[in-house]
Amino acid sequence: MTDIYSLTYEQAEKLLTENGFRATQCINIFRDIYKRRAAGFDEMTLTSADIKALLSDKYFFGKLKIDEILQSVDTSKYLFELSDGCSVETVLMRQKFGKSICISTQSGCNMGCKFCCSGRLRKQRDLTAGEMVSQILAVGGRIVRYKIYKQPCISDKCR
């Protein structure tokens, strides 16, 4: 099975048409997942039951486990555990022009930068597209849920 966050629009259209559904129904899949932030097939309210059954035979919703959150004035660093036990870092940075999320594209790193926990681990593997998207959705969801978007940048570097 594949992480549903790795599913491209073109792949979804092909899957639907090969199984007798209209390709235009693909929009509801992506609205459910990315606009409505469904975290499971039961939360996909715009997608028909038949299409959800088809998807659930081939895909799963990847989940990241938060191991640790480190906070500073304008930065939140998340340590996530992937489904296979590998760890990755994701950083939310609040700046005067807005917020940005720095995601990991691999588990571990061979560079050895002192400021980065990933650099302390040997590279284990590259992440899938779904694992990268999951980082954005996890931190983005926390921004909305905890109203982090209303928190101003208050350090001197932002002024």
Listing of model-derived features with the role each one plays in the protein:
Residues 1-99:
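Flexible, acidic/Gly-rich N-terminal and inter-domain linker regions that tether
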Residues 88-105, 110-159:
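Conserved Radical SAM active-site core
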